[in-house]
Design a protein with these regions (language model features):
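Flexible, solvent-exposed loop/hinge segments and secondary-structure transition points
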Residues: 1-114
């Protein structure tokens, strides 16, 4: 409904890829970004869009985190939490960070984890 072609990745609590969907026309480079958004959300237990607030004005932290492979610091990754237990993450890539996060939230709703 947003008019964007996306990639969607779901990882388990250990960050292992469990499911992946790619819409026709989705950018190839966003395959890995979707997987890494899911991995980041599963690893830290909060939305990837929250990293800006976590980092704040700490430029050294921002530089250091940007050098970490698989760590995504912009929106589109959400943790999967069931009955208070972190069980994985979902990552979406292909649109803007806001569009990606909206799609990830829709995925949570479908899974009954909103």
């Amino acid at each position: 409904m947003l008019g964007v072609a996306i990639n969607v990745a779901v990882v388990d609590g250990s960050g292992t890829l469990m499911a992946f969907l790619r819409m026709n026309g989705a950018f190839l480079h966003s395959i890995d970004i979707a997987i890494d958004k899911a991995y980041t959300a599963a690893s830290f237990g909060f939305p990837t869009s929250k990293w800006g607030g976590v980092i704040g004005d700490d430029e050294l932290l921002r530089i250091g985190l940007n050098q970490r492979q698989r760590l995504v610091l912009f929106g589109g990754g959400l943790p999967l939490v069931d009955e208070g237990q972190r069980i994985g993450g979902i990552g979406v890539s292909g649109g803007s960070a806001e569009q990606d996060e909206a799609c990830a939230r829709a995925g949570l709703k479908v899974l009954g984890l909103n």
